[in-house]
Structure formats: C-alpha cells, structure tokens
C-alpha cells in the first residue's frame, strides 16, 4: 500500500497504528484477501455502539430510552459512517478485489461504512478501550453537538410514512430493482415511488431494509423535509 496515502489517512483519523498490519487488515475487503476486515468490523460495531450509547447517556440525563435509541441509531447507521469515511477519503485506501474495483466498490456506502467499523476494531486491538473511545468521540464531536431528541430521530421510512399519512396521501411503495454480489456481501437497490413524484427515488444498502431506509431518506430530501 502507498505509504504516503496511508500516512495521510492516519493524520485524518487522528491515530497512528503501532501495528500497521491491523490497519492493513481493516482496509482489506473480503474480495481482496482471506485476511479481510470482517472480524474487525464485528468488533468495531459493538465498540461504536457502546461509546455512542454512553455519550448519549451522559449528555441527556432526562431523555428516555426510546429517544436515546433513536439518536444512537441515527449516529451509527450506515450512511452516517459512509459520510465519515468520505471525510477521511477512505475510498482511496481500500484494498478491493478486481471485481469490486471494476464495479466502483470504493464508492459503495456499505463497504465504506463497514471499513470505518473495522478501523475502530483495529484501533481497539492496537491500543485500549480508553484510546478508542476518545478517538470515536473526536470523530463524532460535531454530530453529538448537533443531535437532539425528538421526531427527527425516527427512521426515514417512519418519517416518510407519517408525512404522507398526515396529508392523506397513499403510502410509498418500495421495489427491489437490483441485487448485486454474493450472499455474504450483497448490495440491494430499491426504487421508492411516492405520490406526487414523477420519478421514483433510489436507495442502496447491504440489506433490503437498509436500502429502503436510504430510498426513504432521498424521498424526504426531495420533499424538502430533510
């Protein structure tokens, strides 16, 4: 891997790996090597959930469990992590197999999001829970400052449904138009048709549910609600 690119990434992350092999593994998609990042992703997913849950618990002492769960879901969902990955220019650092490279895997939201979680797992193994917690909180500083309890934290499908019901309009329809990849690493493409929109909006994700949520979010943006 290009050391200039890797050093640039570590500066953006705010962390330099002692064990560079952990960084390399975190950046390796299963299409590129048998020593890929999925176990690190599993670990990072759990650590991220704990760190964000704890941060919300400390910041919002009077907010109930339901609102905290919705805020956490907003902060750790795939499109938030993919957005963060793009801020780190993570796409240019990924190790992908030829097929994924050809199909633009370095832009795929699910791959970017999974890699952020794998990096969190790698940082934890390279250091300790205190270090990874401080790093995650630094990544999330502005997002934690901006988030607040309330209806905005409901998932996009729920918000879209409530918006349409409030105006006595038909519910949206979701149609799977494409499924790419192997069973262990699929990408779903969904068309969401909303009453009053000439064209369906498109969402992609690593599961049908995630793709539907992404499509609903695009619909909310087009409707001027987001």
Swiss-Prot record:
| Pfam families associated with the record | dsrm (PF00035), Ribonucleas_3_3 (PF14622)
Give the enzyme class: hydrolase
Q: What does this protein do?
A: Digests double-stranded RNA. Involved in the processing of primary rRNA transcript to yield the immediate precursors to the large and small rRNAs (23S and 16S). Processes some mRNAs, and tRNAs when they are encoded in the rRNA operon. Processes pre-crRNA and tracrRNA of type II CRISPR loci if present in the organism.
The entry sums up its family as follows: Belongs to the ribonuclease III family.
Q: Which organism is it from?
A: Erwinia tasmaniensis (strain DSM 17950 / CFBP 7177 / CIP 109463 / NCPPB 4357 / Et1/99)
Name the UniProt record assigns to this protein: Ribonuclease 3
Q: Where does Mg(2+) bind?
A: 41, 114, 117
Q: Which PROSITE patterns did the record assign?
A: DS_RBD, RNASE_3_1, RNASE_3_2
EC number in record:
3.1.26.3
Reaction catalysed by this enzyme: Endonucleolytic cleavage to 5'-phosphomonoester
* InterPro entries found in the cross-reference section: dsRBD_dom (IPR014720), RNase_III (IPR011907), RNase_III_dom (IPR000999), RNase_III_sf (IPR036389)
* Protein location: Cytoplasm
Ranges where the RNase III domain occurs: 6-128
Q: Which top-level group of life is the source organism from?
A: Bacteria
- What positions constitute the catalytic site? 45, 117
Supply one GO BP term. Answer: tRNA processing
Print the keywords alphabetically.
Answer: Cytoplasm, Endonuclease, Hydrolase, Magnesium, Metal-binding, mRNA processing, Nuclease, RNA-binding, rRNA processing, rRNA-binding, tRNA processing
Q: How does it assemble?
A: Homodimer.
Q: Which cofactor does it need?
A: Mg(2+)
Its GO CC terms?
A: cytoplasm
**Which gene produces this protein?**
rnc
Q: Which SUPFAM superfamilies match?
A: dsRNA-binding domain-like, RNase III domain-like
